Design a protein with these regions (language model features):
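Active-site-proximal region of nucleotide-activated glycan assembly enzymes
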Residues: 103-156
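Aromatic- and Gly/Pro-rich donor/ligand-binding loops
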Residues: 2-119
Length: 156
């Protein structure tokens, strides 16, 4: 069984984010029928019920650490997760999950992300360090690809 952990802004009833999750779950199940999916969620019970996946509390460091240790692959996305306009705290939350997975030798994919704006130099450097080590990056717009190129990260 191949274990995939999905990190994003899930379980908040945001229609766009939940649509991305539904599409991602469906696509993964079609392409990797023998996969086990776990989602980091604000409302794990609702996420389990809606999508038939395992779900854990997205703000529990212990639950996140366990989920990352168990996974073979982390998918971070979609949405506009990697930006510092709302706050650097949110950016560093998502980067910490990515970096922890990388530290443990997990495959890391950035999926359907709108990257930026990232205004602070320290945030740009932290983002570049994490994303340069990603196994794959797919952004959802040209502006995101341009920002990644600007900070030295190749994107598809």
């Amino acid at each position: 069984m191949y274990n995939i952990l999905i990190s994003g802004y899930y379980g908040f009833d945001n229609i766009g984010d939940e649509s991305i999750l539904r599409t991602l779950v469906t696509s993964l199940r079609e392409r990797i029928p023998d996969c086990s999916l776990t989602v980091l969620s604000h409302d794990p019970a609702a996420t389990r019920e809606k999508y038939g996946v395992e779900a854990v509390e997205r703000m529990s460091p212990l639950a996140i650490a366990r989920a990352v240790r168990r996974c073979d692959m982390l998918i971070s996305g979609g949405g506009s997760l990697l930006q510092d306009v709302t706050s650097s705290k949110s950016l560093h939350y998502y980067l910490a999950i990515i970096r922890f997975a990388q530290l443990l030798g997990k495959k890391v994919f950035i999926y359907s992300q709108g990257i930026g704006p990232i205004e602070k130099d320290a945030d740009r450097r932290a983002t570049a360090r994490a994303l340069r080590r990603a196994d794959g990056i797919v952004v959802r717009d040209e502006r995101s690809a341009a920002l990644l190129a600007e900070i030295g990260v190749p994107a598809e």
